[in-house]
Each structure stands twice: as C-alpha cells, then as structure tokens.
Amino acid sequence: MGTIRLMHAKLHRVQVTEANIDYVGSITIDPILLDKVGILPLEEVDIVNLNNGNRFSTYVIPGETGKGEICPNGGAALLCQPGDLLIIYAYENCDRQEVIQRGHTARVIVADEDNKIQDFLIQTLVPCEDGNKVEFHNSSMIDTILESSQT
C-alpha cells in the first residue's frame, strides 16, 4: 500500500523568545518541550508562524533546559520576531498498511504564554475491527503530566 507521512509530534502556539540571524540555521527549543513530545535534536520540523502566515522547514537544536526558549536562527530568524506564535510539527514515515493494522500515536503540547505546558494531548489512530480503516482519538493527558511532575 505504500508509505505515508504522519505527524508524530507538535508544539502548538509556542511563543518566539528570540530570533538570531547570526546563528547558522535551525531553531533552538527548550529540551523539556522536545522530550515531552519526542522530537530529537537535528530532527527536521515544519513551522507555521501564526502571526504572519510564514511557513518554513528547519532542524532542531536543544536550548537551555527550563528556559522556555523558542529561537529561530539564521534565515528562519527573518520569518519571525519575538512574541510571534508558532506551530512546530515533526513527522515520521509509516507503512500505510501497518498504521491501519496497528494504529499510530502523536504527542501534542499546547503552550501557555511562557512556553510552559498548558495541555498535553495524545492523538491516536486506532484500528477499526473491519481492518480497513482507523478512527481518530484525541485525549488530554495534562493531569497525568502534572501528577508525574509533582512526584
């Protein structure tokens, strides 16, 4: 059936904290955000700027832990300014038939104005009994995240 590209991670409405034209490409992101959704350093991401509609692709580098940093670098810095809201997507290639048979899971962080986790969503494709399609499910896991951070 072929290969399809599915979102596996998303940072929704993160706020640009800095734009650094002098750095050689990429986007710097707080490692806490990267770890929670499963984006790796050097992974390619697509970015949408909600303030001006700019869309671009780049790769990720981790910033300082816990600082909430979102910093487009190099040419990407020309497409954003501090305060802009971004959506950052990461994808993976999947075998279509395997997704239909076994499903797929994506992790989504919805950020607050300080780039802290406001909501944490698990979005899943669940195989249907007939084996020919999947159902989409969207569940908030914020209570689980908050409980685990308190222990």
From Swiss-Prot:
Post-translational modification: Is synthesized initially as an inactive proenzyme, which is activated by self-cleavage at a specific serine bond to produce a beta-subunit with a hydroxyl group at its C-terminus and an alpha-subunit with a pyruvoyl group at its N-terminus.
Single annotated GO MF: aspartate 1-decarboxylase activity
UniProt xrefs under InterPro entries: Asp_de-COase-like_dom_sf, Asp_decarbox
Reactions performed catalytically: L-aspartate + H(+) = beta-alanine + CO2
EC number: 4.1.1.11
Location of the active site: S26, Y59
Compartments reported by the entry: Cytoplasm
One record GO biological process: pantothenate biosynthetic process
Keyword Protease: no
Protein origin, superkingdom: Bacteria
Family, similarity comment: Belongs to the PanD family.
Binding partners and assembly: Heterooctamer of four alpha and four beta subunits.
Task of the protein: Catalyzes the pyruvoyl-dependent decarboxylation of aspartate to produce beta-alanine.
Protein name: Aspartate 1-decarboxylase
Source organism of this protein record: Crocosphaera subtropica (strain ATCC 51142 / BH68)
